[in-house]
Design a protein with these regions (language model features):
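Gly/Pro-enriched, hydrophobic low-complexity segments
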Residues: 124-131, 135-206, 211-214
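Short hydrophobic/aromatic-rich beta-strand segments that constitute the beta-sheet cores
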Residues: 47, 73-77, 89-92, 101, ...
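N-terminal leader/targeting segments and the immediate start of mature chains
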Residues: 16-58, 71-72, 204, 209-214
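An acidic-aromatic
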Residues: 63-111, 180-181
Length: 214
């Protein structure tokens, strides 16, 4: 089975112990940001992911679309469609016309893109860095560091809009030199969803091969 998109294991790599002393200014901004997103029934956004490794002279960009409702989501990116209803995950591989079915792992939390809005509450030290202006927008820059030093990720940098506490981007720094930047675009709050939004409908994928890994 093909590996999951890095956005999906983002929360997994940062599942850590309880947090210590924190920066109150950063904490206030993060709380406002978290409350904003948790108040939504659902949200949809397009995004761009950039993978950079300066030492290896690597820079790659891919774009995608995601729809999230609580712990449920539907992600389309780079020939893959990943659907999660909170219990089951379907990963559809377009080129192979194949869908892999697996159980969601509530402990790993790897299938919860919404974790970006709550992850700071446990296992991180966070610090207010500065305010910057990009494209005429004032952005508060906050850095989070995992307390578990064995973690592959050593830093996460969030950029939060001052005007409405929405997230513009986040950047993940890994020990192997890889840097992942996620830039949120075309954010839509509370899009319509129904019972079938977060399930895989085999009838819509003619001739699909089903691989049940449960």
């Amino acid at each position: 089975m093909k590996k999951y998109f890095s956005l999906l294991f983002f929360a997994t790599t940062l599942a850590l112990p309880a947090a210590a002393q924190q920066d109150p200014k950063a904490g206030k901004i993060l709380d406002q940001m978290s409350a904003k997103y948790q108040a939504l029934k659902a949200f949809q956004a397009t995004f761009t992911q950039t993978l950079e490794n300066p030492s290896a002279k690597v820079k790659q960009n891919i774009s995608g679309d995601i729809l999230v409702s609580g712990q449920k989501f539907r992600l389309k990116i780079s020939g893959q469609e990943v659907i999660n209803d909170g219990k089951t995950t379907w990963t559809y591989l377009k080129n192979e016309n194949e869908v892999n079915i697996s159980d969601s792992d509530p402990d790993a939390q790897e299938m919860s893109p919404s974790q970006i809005y709550t992850m700071y509450k446990k296992g991180y030290k966070y610090n207010y860095v500065q305010q910057v202006t990009e494209g005429g927008e004032a952005l508060d820059v906050i850095e989070l560091a995992p307390e578990n030093r064995q973690n592959d990720v050593f830093k996460v940098r969030l950029k939060v809009r001052e005007k409405d506490a929405s997230v513009k981007s986040w950047q993940m720094f890994k020990k192997n030199g890889n840097q992942y930047t996620f830039l949120i675009k075309n954010f839509k709050p509370n899009p319509p969803t129904d019972a079938g939004t977060f399930t895989f409908d085999k009838a819509k994928y003619k001739g699909v091969k089903v691989v049940d890994l449960r």
